[in-house]
């Protein structure tokens, strides 16, 4: 018997309890690599093994799984690929010794030297050619022979253990009980004192009891796996002869709830009627660290527990044992011809990346993840690494069940839908209705994207449903409606319906042209107001859709329900999201808007609103304003003031107030005031020009995207608003300067009066001011007087301007705040007296 292996591995077991042949690689002087074939030899546990020469490698980090890489000169006893190998430093190994007698099958307690070997990952060779990566198992006990670990025996109980002397002669009889290793030697042992490594010490580092019966059970399990096959691959000829069929179910998948206890479980595909025990591994390294102890306590010998032949399942909590559900494996394959369907089964399984054979499923060994462990991203390998954390991406891919309905000479793979023609009345285009495909899963998933689009699922019964399952009757009804609506626009590009190639449902451009043509027809009918003709055309189109499938009758109730839910009837390939009646809805909305506008034009209230808005805009553009355009400040309108100009200068006010600039003190103050005032005016004008430029740029950008929303009158009103706002700011600055200059006027008059008394009378009479001049009031010129008089006449019913109006009036006619208020108060008093006199004349009162 020959076997093909992809990794440098070997396996020892007893074939006495197996009725089937199995590909086992044993001790060989040449080894095997790649695809080399090697004759296998079955040996027992008590047979002598050859001693390999260890190969030195680097020391692995703490908490990592260990594996020993051996040379090919001797026996490769470690089950594991070289790609996933981590080794310990090179240590001189002693010649191997024969294993103990069959009466003493239990492992003696050992103390590990600084080589921190705790466990190994291994790989199991199978006879499946499609197996691209190894299946991970725990390292079996006899594999410790080839490990580069130094093991020393503990001293007798009467001898105290110390850090300086910890070596005991190798002739010490082994105890009858194996205990977990918790004491690590801190000093190196001379090579001469290193004892022989026992065959069955591998599981001692994991804390298990071990016997020969357990090894035989493992071998028997391995034989059953190879004999029964996976139900999909090369084992179709044998798997029906035995009830122990394996189809990896979701119930035996790795449970996330075990993370919180820090324990992993070996997920062996064990049948329900099998007596092979399930072995829990040691506490997961890295999840829960043991409690720290002092160095003296760690060096104390551990007490010997009672003998125990089976794995220590009793020591675990009962709730933790219940979390590990019993594995139930079902083979849902209906093979009508087991001799002729091997190729068909392999092809169907290879087409769907989520049909994973049982033997290609990696088994969780419960050890820390190896950095070079295979990833689930490669779907060609069709395995799942339970060491990797389960995420949404790989968990959905795991939950796919291996349920195929394989018939004679039938290559249709229902997991990958090939016949998607909606107008094809072939009955083969149906979902897989396998009655055995009913599994209780925690999360519902679809087989692939096409099944999700068509609403086909695995018919899983679960409490938390991710997607709403559609019944078979609703699916048929939707398919019938879809065919009636889209068969005219369907273009079959797949050729043969049974070829299995995917097709393109239809061309989106052609669909758009059909909608566009229908839209034009609807517009022509709307212009003529022929609603009856539109209904007749729609009925004709429905008749055409009925005739496309050869159906003479059509269910009107289903058609009405479809018309009410046309927005949800989207095309299945997700290439177009526009409903069938999308353009019809738009035309109806446009028609309703036109009717509303036509109704508003006849309404008198609507006409009044239009006229009022038109007049409101003309108020800002019909009259000249300050700087040719003043506009509004906020919602206030100052256009009625009829400002022609606003000169931002203080010279006119200084001249009219007759301020004497010959005084050095007054002159210095005026010059300083002018400097600050001119700086503020320049800053305000710059800001105004920037605002106007921004408004112009925004208008230009808006016209490139759409038609201008504002006409010339609206744009002019916006400009007036900007001009009026900054003009008001300048007016405030000018009035504040007037107030400062007005306070300097008495000082100027006093200086002129005192200066005339000091100097000659000629100078005083010629250029100075007399005492009478100091008391004289300022009179306005004709221009300013006519302006303020007109404003007062226009507002005679309420001659009390607001603050903004007062500021602008003061800036226009060069009056300070005090002079302006005085003028308005005097004007109102004179007007009041004048009205009283006129009233007395009318009534004849003397």
From Swiss-Prot:
<keyword id="KW-0371">Homeobox</keyword>
<keyword id="KW-0238">DNA-binding</keyword>
<feature type="region of interest" description="Disordered">
    <location>
        <begin position="394"/>
        <end position="482"/>
    </location>
</feature>
<feature type="region of interest" description="Disordered">
    <location>
        <begin position="151"/>
        <end position="177"/>
    </location>
</feature>
<feature type="compositionally biased region" description="Acidic residues">
    <location>
        <begin position="524"/>
        <end position="546"/>
    </location>
</feature>
<protein>
    <recommendedName>
        <fullName>Homeobox protein 12</fullName>
    </recommendedName>
</protein>
<dbReference type="GO" id="GO:0003677">
    <property type="term" value="F:DNA binding"/>
</dbReference>
<feature type="compositionally biased region" description="Low complexity">
    <location>
        <begin position="331"/>
        <end position="352"/>
    </location>
</feature>
<feature type="compositionally biased region" description="Low complexity">
    <location>
        <begin position="394"/>
        <end position="443"/>
    </location>
</feature>
<comment type="function">
    <text>Putative transcription factor.</text>
</comment>
<feature type="compositionally biased region" description="Low complexity">
    <location>
        <begin position="309"/>
        <end position="321"/>
    </location>
</feature>
<feature type="compositionally biased region" description="Low complexity">
    <location>
        <begin position="78"/>
        <end position="94"/>
    </location>
</feature>
<feature type="region of interest" description="Disordered">
    <location>
        <begin position="286"/>
        <end position="374"/>
    </location>
</feature>
<feature type="coiled-coil region">
    <location>
        <begin position="553"/>
        <end position="604"/>
    </location>
</feature>
<feature type="region of interest" description="Disordered">
    <location>
        <begin position="78"/>
        <end position="103"/>
    </location>
</feature>
<feature type="region of interest" description="Disordered">
    <location>
        <begin position="515"/>
        <end position="571"/>
    </location>
</feature>
<dbReference type="GO" id="GO:0005634">
    <property type="term" value="C:nucleus"/>
</dbReference>
<keyword id="KW-0217">Developmental protein</keyword>
<keyword id="KW-0175">Coiled coil</keyword>
<feature type="compositionally biased region" description="Low complexity">
    <location>
        <begin position="559"/>
        <end position="569"/>
    </location>
</feature>
<keyword id="KW-0805">Transcription regulation</keyword>
<keyword id="KW-0539">Nucleus</keyword>
<keyword id="KW-0804">Transcription</keyword>
<dbReference type="Pfam" id="PF00046">
    <property type="entry name" value="Homeodomain"/>
</dbReference>
<feature type="compositionally biased region" description="Low complexity">
    <location>
        <begin position="458"/>
        <end position="482"/>
    </location>
</feature>
<feature type="compositionally biased region" description="Low complexity">
    <location>
        <begin position="289"/>
        <end position="301"/>
    </location>
</feature>
<feature type="compositionally biased region" description="Low complexity">
    <location>
        <begin position="237"/>
        <end position="249"/>
    </location>
</feature>
<feature type="compositionally biased region" description="Low complexity">
    <location>
        <begin position="160"/>
        <end position="170"/>
    </location>
</feature>
<feature type="region of interest" description="Disordered">
    <location>
        <begin position="230"/>
        <end position="249"/>
    </location>
</feature>
<feature type="DNA-binding region" description="Homeobox">
    <location>
        <begin position="773"/>
        <end position="835"/>
    </location>
</feature>
<dbReference type="InterPro" id="IPR001356">
    <property type="entry name" value="HD"/>
</dbReference>
<dbReference type="InterPro" id="IPR009057">
    <property type="entry name" value="Homeodomain-like_sf"/>
</dbReference>
